[in-house]
Design a protein with these regions (language model features):
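Juxtamembrane or sensor-core-proximal signal-transducing alpha helices
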Residues: 1-3
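… and, occasionally, acidic/histidine-rich disordered N-termini of signaling adaptors
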Residues: 6-183
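Cationic, amphipathic, low-complexity alpha-helical segments enriched
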Residues: 181-183, 187-191
């Protein structure tokens, strides 16, 4: 019985070390500080509820001066959610960023082809350029746009399935004037 207890303790220590390694790997995928980008100011906060979570955000500056911003949340927690974040980031780094709708459609096809079972990725994606932004959503909560000239807050809710749900899903694209502040969020991220 004493031997079993020691084996259990060794196994638990190994599992905790693996979880810590997975957490460190995931955090290395996430920018710790917002980027500097002319004409924009960013603030962000992320707090995962477990060692490895599914929260994800990223920024992709383009050669033409546009900026893509993504905010996402994989279903569940733990290693599968962390793997989905890794796959999403890799898929985005391989993207051509034509527009948020087509980029999200292509990313969905990649995620569906990898097939992580029931794990999905909800994602908002925006392209900021020339005082406006194009926006699409794949199953995320709404974003909020504060219009400084009217002092109003508009909810931006675009229906869409989470990434990996259906191979041939497409994602609607809407265009907005960027007047002041936009808020993206998931359970663990405020951007």
């Amino acid at each position: 019985q004493r031997m079993q207890k020691q084996q259990s303790e060794v196994e638990e220590k190994r599992r905790m070390e693996e979880l810590e390694q997975a957490r460190e790997f995931q955090m290395s995928l996430i920018l710790q500080d917002p980027p500097s980008f002319k004409g924009f100011e960013f603030a962000l906060h992320m707090k995962t509820s477990t060692e490895v979570g599914g929260d994800y955000y990223d920024f992709f500056p383009q050669d033409d001066g546009a900026l893509y911003v993504v905010c996402g949340d994989a279903t569940g927690h733990g290693l599968n959610a962390g793997m989905m974040v890794s796959i999403t980031k890799a898929g985005l780094f391989g993207s051509d960023f034509n527009d948020p709708g087509s980029t999200t459609t292509r990313l969905n096809q990649t995620i569906k082809a990898i097939n992580l079972g029931t794990t999905r990725m909800s994602l908002n994606m925006a392209k900021f350029s020339n005082g406006s932004f194009d926006f699409t959503s794949a199953g995320m909560p709404p974003a909020y746009l504060y219009k400084s000239d009217k002092k109003t807050v508009d909810e931006i809710l675009i229906p869409g399935l989470p990434l990996g749900s259906m191979k041939n899903a497409t994602f609607d694209l809407e265009k907005f004037d960027l007047s002041s502040i936009i808020l993206f969020f998931s359970v663990g991220i405020i951007l």
